[in-house]
């Protein structure tokens, strides 16, 4: 009888104990995006909520107000998000984390994630070829006729350095005076560029712009022929084939000479001919073949910029006006120095545009090629096994030793299906190296 009473008492105690323990059930939790202390409304952003005790993770997308809703058990959580947006040629990356989320059974479970924004240019110059090549001459009798130089085969490659489509429609091309890095710079006084604090750069001779809408897909490129878009290798084997370029700087109304601007290949539609309106004397676009300060920038009315004398600066002379290009509009730039002339080389870009420079040994078929961002490229999901290492395409010590410090062979990796993210630090000394052979070869 005593045993029966003890059992009944134990059952009763358990019953009482169960009644005192509240039932734990999932509760609604709202996590909203915030920027600078204010709500940030962005629909479709993926938010992750991770249980700090069990590591269980939950995913939800934000609604039109920027709020993501979950149903989880009470406990301690961490909310994170990362997303990207593209606008006006720039890539915006947003990151946010809140590690102090305590979800309770009763009460208002509303939390926020403070976003941090970083901005990079979507569009970068992947490669600039402007120094030309040297070719051998064979005399009629078969004897060696020496060598000559061919330099009417320049091009630039624009690359979408992001995973979002890039609008390049408003991109313009120009160079800052003087033409060469080792010549007298009228803008330089006591070691300082007179326009350093004025918010503009002096673009010489002319600027070029697209004549159609241009969209560059993610991790893709377009080739823009600066001079004749034909197969130069047919005459000069050491040169490049630009007959398959995507776009070409060709505007017959500009009055530029035929030697540099022969009729483009039929592969290139007329809609892909760039336009220009020269504002300085000359029968060709005078971009340097040794050391240009080359830039791409955005402008919604480049023809007006070129033809309105109110935009001109005459420091280089009355016959050589320069257009004042706003520094804020510059998308990318590369300062090229003449090889072997460091006692005379001078910067033309301000440090805000390009804090460094890259040497070019011209006439040898070399190009200036952008270095790979190793960490970012390896971090792309599924990318690492497709990357090709032990890059050996830089120039050798008998010229100016130069290579990509990442060790990644970008072109071989692309052919292997990898996606490449290139360095963009606004410092050509870090961002570029001299490549022995054009990537188009």
Regions found by a protein language model. Name each.
Residues 1-4, 19-20:
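Positively charged n-region of N-terminal signal peptides that target proteins for export
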Residues 5-9:
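Sec-dependent signal peptide hydrophobic core
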Residues 14-17:
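C-terminal motif of bacterial Sec signal peptides marking the signal peptidase cleavage site
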Residues 19-28, 34-42, 52-54, 62-65, ...:
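Intrinsically disordered, low-complexity linkers and terminal tails enriched in Ser/Thr/Pro/Gly
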């Amino acid at each position: 009888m005593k045993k029966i009473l003890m059992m009944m008492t134990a059952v009763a105690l358990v019953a009482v104990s169960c009644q005192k323990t509240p039932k734990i059930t999932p509760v609604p939790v709202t996590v909203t995006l915030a920027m600078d202390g204010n709500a940030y409304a962005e629909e479709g952003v993926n938010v992750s909520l991770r249980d700090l005790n069990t590591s269980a993770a939950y995913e939800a997308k934000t609604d039109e107000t920027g709020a993501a809703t979950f149903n989880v058990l009470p406990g301690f959580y961490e909310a994170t998000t990362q997303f990207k947006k593209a606008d006006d040629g720039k890539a915006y990356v947003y990151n946010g984390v809140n590690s102090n989320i305590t979800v309770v059974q009763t009460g208002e479970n509303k939390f926020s994630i403070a976003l941090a924004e970083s901005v990079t240019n979507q569009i970068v110059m992947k490669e600039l070829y402007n120094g030309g090549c040297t070719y051998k001459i064979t005399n009629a009798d078969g004897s060696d006729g020496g060598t000559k130089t061919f330099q009417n085969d320049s091009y630039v490659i624009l690359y979408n350095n992001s995973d979002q489509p890039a609008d390049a429609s408003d991109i313009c091309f120009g160079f800052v005076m003087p033409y060469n890095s080792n010549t007298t710079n009228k803008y330089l006084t006591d070691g300082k560029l007179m326009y350093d604090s004025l918010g503009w750069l002096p673009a010489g001779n002319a600027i070029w712009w697209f004549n159609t809408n241009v969209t560059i897909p993610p991790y893709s490129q377009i080739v823009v022929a600066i001079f004749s878009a034909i197969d130069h290798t047919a005459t000069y084997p050491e040169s490049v084939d630009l007959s398959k370029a995507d776009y070409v700087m060709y505007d017959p109304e500009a009055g530029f000479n035929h030697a540099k601007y022969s009729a483009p290949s039929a592969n290139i539609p007329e809609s892909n001919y760039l336009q220009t309106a020269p504002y300085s004397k000359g029968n060709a676009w005078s971009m340097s073949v040794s050391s240009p300060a080359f830039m791409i920038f955005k402008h919604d009315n480049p023809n007006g910029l070129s033809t309105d004398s109110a935009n001109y600066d005459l420091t280089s002379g009355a016959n050589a006006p320069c257009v004042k290009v706003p520094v804020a509009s510059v998308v990318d730039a590369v300062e090229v120095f003449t090889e072997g002339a460091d006692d005379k080389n001078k910067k033309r870009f301000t440090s805000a545009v390009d804090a460094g420079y890259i040497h070019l040994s011209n006439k040898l078929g070399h190009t200036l090629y952008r270095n790979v961002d190793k960490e970012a490229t390896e971090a792309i999901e599924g990318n690492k096994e497709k990357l090709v290492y032990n890059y050996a395409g830089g120039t050798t010590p008998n010229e100016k030793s130069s290579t990509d410090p990442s060790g990644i062979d970008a072109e071989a990796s692309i052919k292997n299906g990898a996606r490449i993210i290139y360095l963009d630090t606004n410092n050509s000394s870090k961002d570029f190296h001299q490549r022995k052979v054009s990537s188009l070869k």
